[in-house]
Amino acid sequence: MCQGALFLFNGGQPESRKNVQAVFWKQGNNPPFHFISCAEGNSGSRMRAGIVVDGKGQSRIWGDRIVIDWKEEAEKTYGFRVDVLRRGRGSWILETDLGLRLLKEYRGSVNRLEFEEAVLQSLDGMETLKADQYVRNSEGELLSTAEDGTRYIVKEWFADRECDLKDEREVLSAVRALALLHRQFRMIKRQETWNMRSMISLPLFEAMRRHNRELKKARTFIRGKRKKNEFELRVIGNFEIFAAQAVEAERGMEKLYEIHGKEIADGYAVCHGEPDYHHILIGNGYTAVTEFNQMHLGVQMEDLYYFLRKIMEKHDWNERLGRQVMESYERVLPVSEVERQGLYYLFLYPEKYWKQINFYYNANKAWVPAKSTEKIRKLEAQQEARESFIQTVIQGV
């Protein structure tokens, strides 16, 4: 009997090996598979799975539970030959006769896919900047449906590694790629069909206002607790400092929109939406930007803020590196005075602080993970360096 790997999914929620074994053993099956990750189906639902044996798919049906052979499914639907099938991050990586491909479940709309494809095709053919282009199936469709009803997409993929935020040369290459991406996206003519809610960004101060309300609710809750843990005590101790920055950022951003609203709206361009280092791959002579599922029309400075903040958190708000990042970006795409002001208020807003408190407030408040407490400690420790960076690098450049 062969040894393989069984993956079961139902909303991506992990379940114990014991529960999954019970499902199959109850039906008289004794598959010799090695369990890597799994999920138990809800009552009345059908369980979806994929089996890998020596890099190739195997299809089975146990009772009413369909097990999809993704190798066979991809070959049948897309017409290429799959030589190797392996797991990726929430996806399948396919080594095909046409090159590397990524297969992933998709839950959005076809209109959304068409929006992303139209934008990404503007990057097709560029030598130093690449993107994970969508691959249409044999019927010319972007979206495919497997036997069990799973909707999925296939994209071109890359074997390159993720950007190393500890490597300054790679960081500067990555931010240059982001600037090239933004410059190319500004050339794209907006289409009338790009009017879905997920495609257009709301004014940036609206999210700040919502987050500030959430901060106040969480602080009120913590104040009312008699016995407080370390996380809660630290929040009580540092809340006024971070809250003051949050309010100043919201008011400043709203005023910026009041004065320059038309200029900001006219300057809306396509944004990546989540330019994380996981989504920037360093290739041989090129940089690949991937995972555009958060792409939208909005303020591109939000992308730059997101990526630069991640870099600075890793480098303890190193001002020298921060200046180099800004210079690398502006050598490709200069930043206007209004954009710089918006970037200032984005950095002034204590987003990481809000995230930790919001996570606490919406989770099990009786037990706070040690990791959350450590993150609050780190935010406190980095606060002085963060403020200096904002004043000298962002506001003072």
Role assignments for model-derived ranges:
Residues 354-397:
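ATP/Mg2+ or Mg2+-diphosphate-binding catalytic cores
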Residues 99-196:
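ATP-binding pocket architecture of kinase catalytic cores
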Residues 301-334, 347-367:
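Active-site activation/catalytic loop segments of kinase-like enzymes and analogous catalytic loops
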